[in-house]
Design a protein with these regions (language model features):
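Cell-surface, membrane-associated systems
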Residues: 41-170
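Aliphatic-rich helix starts adjacent to a transmembrane/signal segment
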Residues: 1-40
Length: 170
């Protein structure tokens, strides 16, 4: 009876952790979606086709092995106090990407055997616009990263966009 109670308790606590992790991810997504398309008033960067504020690429779901991909682009400014007056501000763009790949997490089944879970892990990348190459890149400074796992064990990630009138797009 102890084993049954212990297994039930573990399942309940695991579900609570998953639920909290999901809420944390949604909060993070909301903060970044609010930044989409932001530009400073004096921003002098030329617009580019890669600077789409929000871009959603539809996935095929768990059966197809892919989930939706979300790209968010927003403006920022780098300040250099040692630069000459009038050249201290350099405007830039950041691209945040959320994407999925098959999870590699292994779970232990009630009979003691192990199997890889049937789900995705969510990866996040943060890239900065490189004016010299006209592409988003990592490695330009230590705040950038590529495909860092933010959440494991997700059944699917689906984004449903709406227009200004509340009608579903796509």
């Amino acid at each position: 009876s102890y084993t049954i109670v212990n297994n039930t308790y573990r399942q309940v606590t695991d579900r609570a952790k998953l639920s909290q992790a999901g809420r944390d991810l949604i909060g993070q997504l909301l903060r970044e979606i609010r930044m989409a398309g932001y530009r400073y008033v004096n921003d002098d960067m030329a617009p580019d086709n890669d600077h789409v504020a929000i871009k959603i690429t539809k996935g095929s779901g768990l059966e197809g092995g892919t989930c939706d991909n979300l790209q968010i682009v927003y403006g920022s400014v780098d300040y250099t106090s040692t630069a000459a007056e009038g050249e201290r501000y350099e405007y830039t763009r950041y691209q945040i990407t959320y994407e999925c790949e098959k999870s590699t997490q292994v779970e232990t089944l009630p009979d003691g055997s192990k199997q890889t879970i049937d789900g995705f892990k969510i990866l996040k990348s943060k890239k900065k616009w490189d004016i010299a190459t006209n592409t988003f890149k990592t490695g330009l400074d230590d705040t950038l990263y590529e495909e860092e796992m933010v959440l494991d064990y997700v059944q699917d990630l689906i984004f449903v966009p709406f227009d200004a009138n509340g009608k579903q797009i796509g």
